[in-house]
Amino acid sequence: MSVELNDLGRVHFIGIGGAGMSGIVRIMLARGISVSGSDAKESAGLLELGALGASVHAGHAAQNVAGADTVVISTAIRANNPELEFARTQGLRVLHRSEALAAAMAQDTVVAVAGTHGKTTTTAMIAVLLREAGLDPSFAVGGTVPALGVNAAHGAGGIFVAEADESDGSFLNYRPQIAVVTNAEPDHLDHYGTAEAVMEAFQSFIGLIPADGLLVACTDDDGALALAKQAAARGTRVVTYGRSAAAEVWLINDGAHRAIEFITPIGPQRLVLELQVPGEHNALNALAAFAVALELGVEAEQALSALAGFTGAARRFEFKGQVRGIRVFDDYAHHPTEVRAALTAARTVADGHHVLVLFQPHLFSRTHEFAAEFAAALSLADSIMVLDVYPAREDPIPGVTGELITEANAKLTFQPDRAKAIQELVARTANGDIVLTVGAGDVTEAGAAILDALATPAQEVSHGG
């Protein structure tokens, strides 16, 4: 369903406090749309949206929808939600969150960032880069960006940078002028069923690029490279990036420093690439952002300067604090490839010291599908405690627990009791070590408990922002 923002009337969001929903609300309010919404319980985020002008309610009830013309839901909202039932009974327009975001983007030049991994960081990099270049983009990112202070905002520049989520196929609601594909691997098989269906969805996504549009794709990833070849074969303009000299934006790492080489009208140009965020995966994300910036008219030196100042996105190798020389980080990684990238980065940051991990599997279906791959990726750490599965939207699968991962590798320890897992992990730490909480569930809350466990009365905790 394709709709214009001004046709929506008064918009009611069910689950307004969610990260993705609240970002769209901010943008709609800034663009003069009347907004109401509800969430399961009162929170600081709910009160903040109320202060911005939304009519907000704690708890779900049919009367909350009164006066609305359009109702917005996410995949997490169940069919028996009383507000959704009321909306359908009354014949109100019901949009998925992605359709509402598409309506908000309809009048702008859309940069949509897709990929199994790296979407949030790459989207954040592009938004920060374009803002610092004075292009004043609107943006919607999957996590809060410290440099921007929020995860979404309205800009007056006529450019909209959006993270395009493939998990439920909703990225097919967007109409990108510039599409970025960081990688394309099997994931979210609970929705797609097969790896082939995942790739078909990505093929459909790049098929949305108009004749005068652009695909930016990573040559390091087989899936993204295949998509680039398919797009080029049907006449779509493609810019590739990666560690291969065949890429048009080329990452060079000679050991002493990184550089970026790219094609200009007068021939190849090479400049130093400096980043605060660790890991080769983030260097590749930076190349994607750089390629988009060049396409939108940003000077190369200005783009690299902005990237050098980029400090990351929330829950993407985010520093949480330090006690007794032991640093604690948090990462959203929830796929084996992401876990491997996070731990490779942690190894670099640890500089020879130990890396200890508290991992929480996310989704029963993903744990069942990738147990052995998770075990292999986690084994890059020196000490690994595995919690039980964070179910999110899923019902349990018989026989599938966090222990399924530890069975594949004796180096891993299954401990479903989080407090005991933290206690065991902290007991193994020494000065200079890194502790990393990993997963897309509520394991992020463990960072504070780890810092508390590390602290003693004589030592003060240094918390990260």
Swiss-Prot record:
Gene3D superfamilies membership: Mur ligase, C-terminal domain, Mur-like, catalytic domain, NAD(P)-binding Rossmann-like Domain
Enzyme class, UniProt record, top EC level: ligase
Molecular function via GO: ATP binding; UDP-N-acetylmuramate-L-alanine ligase activity
GO CC list: cytoplasm
Assigned protein family: Belongs to the MurCDEF family.
Protein role: Cell wall formation.
Protein name stated in the entry: UDP-N-acetylmuramate--L-alanine ligase
Organism from which the protein derives: Renibacterium salmoninarum (strain ATCC 33209 / DSM 20767 / JCM 11484 / NBRC 15589 / NCIMB 2235)
Chain's gene name: murC
